[in-house]
C-alpha cells in the first residue's frame, strides 16, 4: 500500500507437512487486510520441474484454495509456462476460473522462450482469454531468442496489438 501498488505477487514456498492447511490459514489472515487496504494478493504456482519441491505446482488446488478463501482481493497468477510444464494447462479450466486470476505470465515451453518457439499455441489461448471478462495484465516473462520487436508477432495474431 505504501508503495502505491494495487497488487503484489507472492510464492507459496517449499513443500512441507500441512502446507495446504497453512497456506489457507495465511490467506484467511491476509483476507481482511487486503480487502480493507484494497490491495490484491496474487499467488503464483510454479512447476516443480524447474523449482524442485515447490508446494502446490498445479493450478487446480490453488483454485480450490481461492474458492475457500472467497475474496476478490486474493487471486492467482496463472503462469501458462509453469502449467504447461506440469502437463496441466487447460484453457477450459482457465475460462471457468477467470474471476480467480489476477495476472497471467506468458513463456513458451520447453525453454521458457518467446511464444512460437515451443509447443504452446499462444495465439489461440490469448484469443480465448480475450473472450472472457478478464481485464488484468498479461506479463511477457520469457528469454527472447530474437530481437524484442520480433517476439511480439503472437500478440498481433491474437488481436492484442
Name the predicted role of every residue range.
Residues 23-43, 48-51, 144:
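N-terminal/domain-start segments enriched in small and hydrophobic, helix-friendly residues
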Amino acid at each position: 500500500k505504501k508503495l502505491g501498488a494495487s497488487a503484489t505477487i507472492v510464492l507459496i514456498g517449499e513443500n512441507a507437512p500441512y502446507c495446504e492447511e497453512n497456506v489457507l490459514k495465511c490467506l484467511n489472515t491476509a483476507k481482511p487486510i487486503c480487502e480493507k487496504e484494497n490491495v490484491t494478493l496474487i499467488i503464483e504456482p510454479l512447476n516443480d520441474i524447474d523449482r524442485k519441491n515447490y508446494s502446490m505446482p498445479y493450478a487446480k488446488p490453488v483454485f480450490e484454495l481461492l474458492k475457500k478463501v472467497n475474496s476478490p482481493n486474493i487471486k492467482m497468477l496463472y503462469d501458462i509456462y509453469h502449467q504447461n510444464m506440469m502437463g496441466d494447462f487447460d484453457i477450459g479450466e482457465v475460462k471457468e476460473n477467470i474471476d480467480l486470476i489476477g495476472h497471467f505470465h506468458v513463456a513458451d515451453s520447453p525453454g521458457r522462450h518467446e511464444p512460437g518457439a515451443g509447443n504452446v499455441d499462444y495465439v489461440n489461448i490469448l484469443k480465448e482469454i480475450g473472450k472472457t471478462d478478464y481485464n488484468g495484465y498479461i506479463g511477457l516473462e520469457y528469454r527472447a531468442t530474437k530481437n524484442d520487436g520480433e517476439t511480439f508477432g503472437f500478440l498481433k495474431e491474437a488481436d492484442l496489438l
